[in-house]
Amino acid sequence: MARTKGHIERPSNKSAKAVKNVAFKAAKKMLSKDSTKKKRAHPGAVALTEIKVLQRSTELLLRKAPFQALVREIAQVSKSDLRFQSAAISALQEAAEAYLVGLFEDTNLCAIHAKRITIMPKDMQLARRIRGERT
């Protein structure tokens, strides 16, 4: 059998150009989206705005279900089968959050006094010692 040259059909120039053009436009759109980057905030600016928002708000910072589970777990140590009113759990949560916020404020002051902006465990220990809570 003699060899014959097989005829391979190639796409016409028009359709190839159309496909290429569509791909080019899509790539151009993707690049234009990436090239318009938002301006980055200065380091610490986002944290400061977060702090301001949280200081203005009055809602609780700790989630209710995990806090309630923690209270029940701690109460289980002293006496089993204790029941809590929801108002009692809410009062405990308010008091706990007020204590923690105050402690973190004092801890931050200790860090600032040491010419740092990052709080460390030694700052918290010092704050508790100054308060007279150290055991």
Swiss-Prot record:
Highest taxon above the source species: Eukaryota
Output the Gene3D superfamilies linked to this UniProt entry. Histone, subunit A
GO (cellular component) term, any one? nucleus
Per the UniProt entry, the signal peptide is none
Matching Pfam families, A to Z? Histone (PF00125)
Query: What's the chief localization of this chain?
Result: nucleus
CDD domains in alphabetical order: HFD_H3 (cd22911)
Q: Cite the record's note on assembly.
A: The nucleosome is a histone octamer containing two molecules each of H2A, H2B, H3 and H4 assembled in one H3-H4 heterotetramer and two H2A-H2B heterodimers. The octamer wraps approximately 147 bp of DNA.
The name under which this protein is listed is: Histone H3
What is the organism of origin for this protein? Entamoeba histolytica (strain ATCC 30459 / HM-1:IMSS / ABRM)
